[in-house]
Structure formats: C-alpha cells, structure tokens
Design a protein with these regions (language model features):
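Conserved, structured core segments of small domains
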Residues: 1-103
Length: 103
C-alpha cells in the first residue's frame, strides 16, 4: 500500500546538521534507506519539511520507514494512505456498494 509520509525538520536540529555540513549526506542516507517512490521538500506548518511517497507491503516495514527520520532529524511525522488512479478505479465497486447500502 502507498502512503504519503510527511515530516517536519525541527529548526534547531536541521540548523545543526547544516552548520556541521552533514545535512545533505544525512538526507541522502535517509532516502537510500527508506527508498521512497517520490520525494518533495517544502515547508510544513512553518518548518522545513518533506514528503516521501512510500510503498509498504506489510505493517512490519513501518519502523524501517520512520525510525531514520526520528533518530537523524528528531522529526515529527504523519502517515496518510494514498491511492493512484488505478487503485481508485479498482476500489470503485466497493465505493458504489457502500453508497447503495449507506447513502
């Protein structure tokens, strides 16, 4: 299943990595470990942040996806299940059944 993993980089921690000259290396290492399908960097709620689109086949993969962000960046995270257009099309019969039953 695909998830959108958004994270904030606390200013103090990110600034320290930048001053040490290890910020880019740290981010590269995290991305190599997590292997996101897509990556975007932005601001989130006024802080440096990023969005990784990740794929997990099993819930046991979750620690490997989030712990690098917790340990390296002290990053608060949010996970949100996302679908591709193909996923939505595949799920449309269940959507229609629910609408008929509960709508």
């Amino acid at each position: 299943m695909r998830f959108m993993l958004s994270f904030q980089m606390p200013t103090e921690r990110a600034n320290a990595l930048i001053k040490e000259g290890t910020f880019a290396q740290t981010m590269q290492s995290i991305m190599e470990d997590i292997k996101p399908e897509a990556v975007y960097f932005t601001n989130l709620d006024g802080a440096r942040g990023g969005i990784f689109f990740i794929n997990m086949d099993d819930a046991s993969e979750l620690p490997g996806m989030v712990e690098p962000l917790f340990h390296a960046l002290d990053a608060p995270i949010k996970l949100q299940l996302v679908m591709t257009p193909e996923d939505l099309q595949k799920g449309t019969p269940a959507l229609e059944q629910a609408a008929q039953k509960y709508g």
